[in-house]
Amino acid sequence: MRWFGSGDDEKKKKQVGETWADSLRADSWGQSLTNPRTLIPTFAFTITTVTALRLYKTFLRRIPTVNHVKPHYFRRKGIFGKVTTVGDADNFRLYHTPGGRIAGWGWLPWKMVPTKREGLSNQTVGLPCHLGLLSIVSDSPSLVANNFQLHIRLAGVDAPELAHWGREEQPYAKEAQEWLINLIHNRRVRAYIYRRDQYDRIVAQVYVRRWLFRKDVGLEMLKAGLATIYEAKSGAEFGTSEAKYRAAEEKAKAQKVGMWAKPTLLQKLGGASTKAPESPREYKARHAAADKLKKT
């Protein structure tokens, strides 16, 4: 004689065992994979992963050196970062900080911009004052290559040359460099990149925000009379701003500001020239011709 209810328990156990075994035999792998309970989570996970990777590669992946700047970035992408050093008055070093403060740069412990030279080595984008983060370093292409930094050159403008390789310093070169340092050093800038030049620098149009206003660094330099239009036979980049740049240079000449200022009486007595100032392009051409004569 069985106890009351014992038969039901055994029946349930048997049903559970048969259901599990039967399900293994009844459901093929094809049926399992096409089951909505399997498909929906799989698709959701795949789409989320692909989207996250896409967002990271597009907006959050840091560009440590010029060699990581892909060709499809040119004329299509802006680089946001902090200027670590300024070289000559038309180039600087940039530490790329994708996403800015929203992505944690400047306040998360693992997203702090290095302040020491060894921390910046191999991690900044070099730009001859065209965009990006500034880093006070020599404009020597060899140093740029050795440090593997993002070196940025300002697009469309040419600033007076500092003393390099035994050549004399141009008038207003130091003033132009100090002006640029005051404007962008240790500040965040956005550089719209145009191309990579022969010295492995990124030519870019750079913007810096001062209060609520965004300023075009190259344009402001022309307005201050501390740079000229870049007049090389090839390689000049202006984006859509060439007319604006040329108008700013002409206005600075007319107002006689910066390098276009006429010498004062005391400067004339001291031997200052009253001729039109030698442009950076003329300076480079003169020294190139002199170097060529020395070799012959």
Swiss-Prot record:
One of its GO terms (molecular function) is metal ion binding. It is found in: Mitochondrion; Membrane. Its main location: mitochondrion. It holds the Pfam family SNase. Ca(2+) binds at residue 158. It comes from the Eukaryota. SMART domains: SNc (SM00318). The keyword Nucleus does not apply. Residues 77-262 form the TNase-like domain. The keyword Repeat does not apply. It comes from Phaeosphaeria nodorum (strain SN15 / ATCC MYA-4574 / FGSC 10173). This is Probable endonuclease LCL3. One of its GO terms (cellular component) is mitochondrion. SUPFAM superfamilies: Staphylococcal nuclease (SSF50199).
